[in-house]
Structure formats: structure tokens, C-alpha cells
A protein has these predicted regions:
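Conserved PLP-anchoring active-site segment centered on the Schiff-base-forming lysine
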Residues: 56-78
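A short helix-loop-beta submotif of the ANL/AMP-binding
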Residues: 80-86
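Active-site PLP attachment segment
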Residues: 159, 166-173
Length: 173
């Protein structure tokens, strides 16, 4: 209590030490280099991140691809912010992975953002490297930003996968 440096609010972007620790974590567990100064932002929870990303990348009227089933916050925040929700279906028949043939047939004009969620909630479907590779290629082909929400990856899978392991992913994720 007697040290003035122990009081006050943390920097909005988190302390450099925390961001550096997060970058080391990503390197250790996913073998992905992230710049702690420009590519790491500590958050108080997923909803804050979903809001920040949507506000930064989408305007009212823009379209957002949302998995069905998926985390309800993707839909609710986009609706509040005036975006159009375009659902893409996930099916147990293909392991809860996106149906890329169906996605390619959709009207993608005006789509700015695509939410993915692996391990998938609520289904528990696990990520596959091939899915991440196809998502990156899809995003580049259609100029869409992919945001992969990666919850529970240490609980539901022993394989450590990140979409950022795919070459070129940082260009569209």
C-alpha cells in the first residue's frame, strides 16, 4: 500500500510483461510467433474481444458469417451493431466443420467477417489443420477476415492447433 506504483489502472493494452508472456505462450504451445507489441491484446473475456473486433472491422449493414450452431454472442453483438447475420450450417455428418462447397455457393457480397469456433461450442467439434488451411484460402479468395475463437483447446484436444499455424493466416485472420 505504501508503494505508489502498486495502485492505479493497468494500461489499456496490458502491461508489456503480460503481452510478452502471452507471446511466449503462443510460441511454446502452438509454435507461432506473435509480436507482443502489435499482435497481442489482453481482454477481460471473449465478449469484449468479439465486440472490439466487430466494431473495428464491420459497419452497419455489413454481413457477418456466423456458424450454426455457434456461440450466441457472435449473433447478438452483430445484431446490436446493425450487421446482417448470414448463418452457415455445421453438421455432425462432417465433424462440425464448415461445408466449403455450400459456402462457395452463398452470396458473399458484403461479407466482411467470418466467425469460426474451434473447439466448437456447443458441439465440442475439434479443429482440423485441413479446416484451417481451407478457411485461410477461402478468406483470401473472398477478402473476408476469419476470426477463430479458440476456447477450451487445452481441454478438448491434445493436439495443439491454431489457425495462425497456416502460412499466410495473419493476412486474413
Amino acid at each position: 500500500a505504501s508503494q505508489s506504483s502498486a495502485h492505479g489502472y493497468q494500461p489499456t493494452g496490458g502491461t508489456p510483461e503480460l503481452r510478452q508472456a502471452m507471446a511466449h505462450f503462443y510460441k511454446r504451445w502452438y509454435d507461432v510467433d506473435v509480436n507482443p507489441d502489435t499482435e497481442v491484446l489482453p481482454l477481460i473475456g471473449s465478449k469484449e474481444g468479439i465486440l472490439h473486433i466487430t466494431l473495428a472491422l464491420c459497419n452497419p449493414g455489413d454481413k457477418v458469417l456466423v456458424p450454426n450452431p455457434g456461440y450466441p454472442t457472435y449473433t447478438s453483438l452483430s445484431k446490436i451493431l446493425g450487421q446482417q447475420i448470414v448463418n452457415y450450417d455445421l453438421s455432425e455428418d462432417n465433424g462440425w466443420q464448415p461445408d466449403f462447397d455450400a459456402l462457395e455457393q452463398m452470396d458473399l457480397e458484403g461479407v466482411k467477417l467470418m466467425w469460426t469456433n474451434y473447439p466448437n461450442m456447443p458441439t465440442g467439434g475439434r479443429a482440423m489443420r485441413e479446416t484451417y488451411e481451407r478457411l485461410v484460402a477461402f478468406a483470401k479468395r473472398h477478402n473476408i477476415v476469419i476470426v477463430n475463437d479458440n476456447p477450451y483447446s487445452f481441454i478438448l484436444s491434445e493436439e495443439r492447433l491454431s489457425i495462425l499455424q497456416v502460412p499466410g493466416a495473419k493476412e486474413c485472420c
